[in-house]
C-alpha cells in the first residue's frame, strides 16, 4: 500500500465493553427502588435512553415503574430542596451611589 492511502486508515483502538445496566435476573418493578433510582438524575428527572444505555422495551418499563413508584409515594416527584446557608452580611461600601444635593 502506498503512503498516500495509508494516511486515511484509522487505527483500531481496543475498548472495554461496559456491562449492561440491567442484568438478566433484575426485575423491573416499581417496588425495586434500588434499581429504579439508578435511572433518575440528581434533579429527579428520568434519564434518557441514550444515557441509560437501555433497550427501548427496558426504557419503557423503567419509565412506567418510576411513574408508579412516584404515584405510590415510594419515590419523590421532586428531590428535597437544598437549603442555602446565608453567610454573614458584609457592609457594602464599593459601588454605592451617593445622592447629590
UniProtKB/Swiss-Prot annotation:
Entries under Pfam families matching the protein:
Ribosomal_S18
Record has RNA-binding as a keyword: yes
Which InterPro entries does the UniProt record give? Ribosomal_bS18, Ribosomal_bS18_sf
- Keyword flag Ribosomal protein: yes
Q: Name one GO molecular function term.
A: structural constituent of ribosome
Identify the GO cellular component terms for this protein: chloroplast; mitochondrial small ribosomal subunit
Name where it's found: Plastid, Chloroplast
Gene Ontology process terms (BP) = translation
Q: Which family does it belong to?
A: Belongs to the bacterial ribosomal protein bS18 family.
Q: How does it assemble?
A: Part of the 30S ribosomal subunit.
- For this entry, the protein name equals Small ribosomal subunit protein bS18c
Q: Which gene codes for it?
A: rps18
Amino acid at each position: 500500500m502506498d503512503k498516500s492511502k495509508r494516511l486515511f486508515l484509522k487505527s483500531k483502538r481496543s475498548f472495554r465493553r461496559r456491562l449492561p445496566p440491567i442484568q438478566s435476573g433484575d426485575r423491573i418493578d416499581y417496588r425495586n427502588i434500588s434499581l429504579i433510582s439508578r435511572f433518575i438524575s440528581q434533579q429527579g428527572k428520568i434519564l434518557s435512553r441514550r444515557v441509560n444505555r437501555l433497550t427501548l422495551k427496558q426504557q419503557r418499563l423503567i419509565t412506567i415503574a418510576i411513574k408508579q413508584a412516584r404515584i405510590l409515594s415510594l419515590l419523590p416527584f421532586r428531590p428535597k430542596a437544598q437549603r442555602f446557608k446565608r453567610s454573614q452580611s458584609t457592609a457594602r461600601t464599593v459601588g454605592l451611589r451617593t445622592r447629590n444635593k
